[in-house]
């Protein structure tokens, strides 16, 4: 039996074993159409807090990940609940590192309530390799039938 485990261990590439398993908490949000129609029925989400953490120079596999955490609250009075919505991100100013901005519309699976936290990650590199990052992002709510709400702006910035 030990021989079987040893053989299986040897067949797994070392690179796959060393890959960082941490990922964002976001998942794709299904919409019935790829077209978006701006709607005044959807308010902008309220940005409560933005946390921005650069990658580290440690020896652990995930140390070079950067983290951007955006905590939002859905305004009262909307005819939509937060769990009925997805969110789309776009860069208004600056250049986002590859992998930071989610492709398409995203949601946090299983979420309930008026508050939500989006965890975005990217390969930030070691501190000596990092570029300064100053971004202005927009985040908008999107319904399953393609209605898109007003944007909220998120400022992200910091020297490496």
Predicted regions and their residues:
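N-terminal signal peptide c-region/cleavage motif recognized by signal peptidases
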Residues: 11-15
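Short, compositionally biased P/S/T/A/G/V-rich stretches that sit at domain boundaries
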Residues: 19-75, 160
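Solvent-exposed loop/turn segments flanking beta-strands in beta-repeat/beta-sandwich domains
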Residues: 75-102
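Solvent-exposed serine/threonine-rich low-complexity stretches and specific carbohydrate-binding patches
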Residues: 98-114, 155
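Signal that preferentially marks extracellular ectodomain short beta-strand elements
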Residues: 113-129
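Extracellular Ig-like/FN3 beta-sandwich strand-entry sites
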Residues: 130-134
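Extracellular fibronectin type III
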Residues: 147-158
């Amino acid at each position: 039996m030990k021989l079987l485990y040893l053989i299986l261990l040897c067949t797994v590439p070392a690179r796959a074993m060393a890959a960082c398993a941490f990922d964002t908490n976001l998942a794709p949000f299904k919409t019935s159409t790829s077209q978006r129609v701006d709607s005044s029925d959807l308010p902008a989400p309220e940005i409560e807090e933005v946390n921005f953490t650069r990658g580290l120079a440690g020896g652990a596999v995930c140390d070079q990940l950067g983290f951007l955490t955006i905590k939002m609250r859905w305004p009262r009075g909307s005819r939509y609940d937060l769990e009925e919505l997805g969110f789309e991100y776009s860069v208004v100013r600056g250049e986002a590192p590859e992998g930071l901005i989610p492709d398409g519309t995203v949601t946090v699976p299983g979420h309930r309530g008026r508050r939500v936290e989006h965890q975005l990650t990217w390969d930030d590199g070691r501190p000596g390799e990092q570029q300064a990052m100053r971004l202005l992002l927009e985040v908008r709510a999107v319904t399953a039938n393609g209605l898109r709400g007003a944007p909220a702006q998120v400022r992200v910035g910091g020297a490496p």
